[in-house]
Regions:
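N-terminal Rossmann-like NAD(P) cofactor-binding subdomain of oxidoreductases
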Residues: 1-144
């Protein structure tokens, strides 16, 4: 079963998640990105990274999409996570990488938008659990 992912915040962390998921190639599909920047800049920053170098993929864009090696990703520009139509896009997991919505109540707004789960990339408050790979990843409960 393919896991459908949305990324909220496409700065350094969001783009790194994108690249990691793209390179992993497992049953993970990035279906949407929410960021306040325009798609031309978003596509350029994805393709040309000053730290990681050039993405070895063809990257093009339209007014509301980015296409990476033929796979089209919807680009949204919503300030309020509750307004992002994750459910309509079939998103299973949202990666919250803005650094803004780190409180559980704020991150849960993605659930209101239709996402099934939210992964917060920054230290969070009132979270269900903090997981550090290599330390306590065995504590993750997929049912929660």
């Amino acid at each position: 079963m393919t896991i459908r992912v949305g990324i909220n915040g496409f700065g350094r962390i969001g783009r790194n998640y994108f690249r990691a998921l793209l390179e992993q190639g497992a049953d993970i599909e990035i279906v949407a990105v929410n960021d306040l920047g325009d798609t031309a800049t978003t596509a350029h920053l994805l393709k040309y990274d000053t730290i990681l170098g050039r993405l070895k993929a063809e990257v093009t864009h339209t007014a509301d999409t980015i296409t990476v090696d033929g796979h089209t990703i919807k680009v949204l520009s919503e300030r309020n996570p509750a307004d992002i139509p994750w459910g309509q896009l079939g998103v299973d997991i949202v990666i919250e990488s803005t650094g803004i919505f780190t409180k559980k109540a704020d991150a849960e707004k993605h659930i209101a938008g239709g996402a099934k789960k939210v992964l917060i990339s920054a230290p969070a408050k009132d979270e269900d659990i903090t997981i550090v790979m290599g330390v306590n990843q065995d504590k993750y409960d997929a049912a929660n």
